[in-house]
């Protein structure tokens, strides 16, 4: 049985609707830290096995959780568990800094960037670009039904970055006004497909039709080492409007052929050629 504090973190992860793979991975690492702090060493090994499994089950579409679970050793050494969890968090922070610096190089003065949903990695790119005194505008889809785009709008407003919010149904129309597109990712599959908030594939198609370069920002811990696109399970959440059931598949798959490049902390990789 996992300690109450660990169960609280798992429930918080399951309930989250806005923040994505990065936030969930951080919370997952915190769960391992809490486990090491609260459980006797005699019980630790079995508890780690259970937590590794339950972390992945929070959202199997997020490779960050799978890679976190793989990173954590099955051991009864509390200090080793703490050390590995802190090391994972350190690598996450370092990866985000490097990714943001690389991604900001793609933004030129006067660019109009269209994005979908909320990605902390894309937000970091925007922050670095602004710090480098680049002038640009962001077009944000509202990203219904959870409206993650409005969360991004709040962040950009606080940063003083110009933006406008559009309904999801207008992404094809407004894509014509964009010069570049950047989105995040919850998983990059072994064969180079991107799993992200439903609607990402539609934006990629619109960008392809309008000749707008479509980039994905994803640290390498979001790359799944084994899962291919035909093995991804796209989960659906209950949703209704005016008494009618509305289909609400959370994620979609964007084929690599529509992706100009994936921005990582190691550089820009071209799928599927550069994905190992």
Curated annotation (Swiss-Prot):
Oligomer status and interactors: Complex of two different subunits.
Keyword Iron-sulfur included in the entry's annotation: no
InterPro entries according to UniProt: eIF2B_alpha/beta/delta, IF-2B-related, IF_2B-like_C, M1Pi_N, NagB/RpiA_transferase-like
Transmembrane region(s): none
PANTHER family per the UniProt record, alphabetical: TRANSLATION INITIATION FACTOR EIF-2B SUBUNIT ALPHA
Name of this chain's protein: Putative translation initiation factor eIF-2B subunit 2-like
Disulfide bonds: none
Function: Catalyzes the exchange of initiation factor 2-bound GDP for GTP.
Organism, scientific name: Pyrococcus abyssi (strain GE5 / Orsay)
Molecular function terms from GO: guanyl-nucleotide exchange factor activity; translation initiation factor activity
Record-stated family: Belongs to the eIF-2B alpha/beta/delta subunits family.
Coiled coil location: none
Keyword Protein biosynthesis on entry: yes
Source domain of life: Archaea
Cited NCBIfam families: PRK08335.1 (NF006210)
Keywords for the protein's UniProt record, in alphabetical order: Initiation factor, Protein biosynthesis
């Amino acid at each position: 049985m996992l300690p109450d504090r660990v169960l609280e973190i798992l429930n918080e992860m399951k309930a989250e609707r806005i923040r994505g793979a990065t936030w969930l991975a951080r919370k997952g690492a915190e769960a391992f830290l809490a486990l090491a702090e609260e459980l006797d060493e005699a019980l630790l090994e079995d508890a780690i096995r259970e937590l590794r499994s339950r972390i992945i089950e929070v959202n199997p579409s997020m490779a960050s959780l799978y890679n976190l679970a793989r990173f954590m050793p099955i051991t009864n050494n509390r200090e080793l568990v703490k050390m590995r969890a802190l090391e994972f968090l350190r690598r996450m922070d370092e990866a985000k800094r490097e990714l943001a610096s690389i991604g900001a190089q793609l933004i030129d003065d006067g660019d109009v960037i269209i994005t979908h949903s909320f990605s902390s990695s894309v937000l970091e790119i925007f922050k670095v670009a602004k710090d480098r005194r680049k002038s640009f505008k962001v077009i944000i889809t509202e990203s219904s039904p959870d409206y993650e785009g409005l969360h991004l709008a709040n962040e950009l407003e606080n940063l003083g970055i110009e933006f406008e919010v559009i309904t999801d149904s207008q992404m094809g129309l407004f894509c014509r006004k964009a010069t570049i597109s950047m989105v995040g990712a919850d998983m990059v599959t072994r064969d180079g497909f991107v799993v992200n908030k439903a609607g990402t594939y539609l934006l990629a198609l619109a960008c392809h039709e309008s000749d707008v370069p479509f980039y994905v920002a994803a640290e390498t811990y979001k790359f799944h080492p084994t899962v291919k696109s035909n093995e991804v399970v796209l989960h659906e959440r209950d949703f209704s409007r005016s008494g009618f059931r509305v289909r609400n598949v959370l994620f979609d798959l964007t084929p690599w052929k529509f992706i100009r490049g994936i921005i990582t902390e190691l550089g820009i990789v071209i799928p599927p050629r550069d994905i190992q």
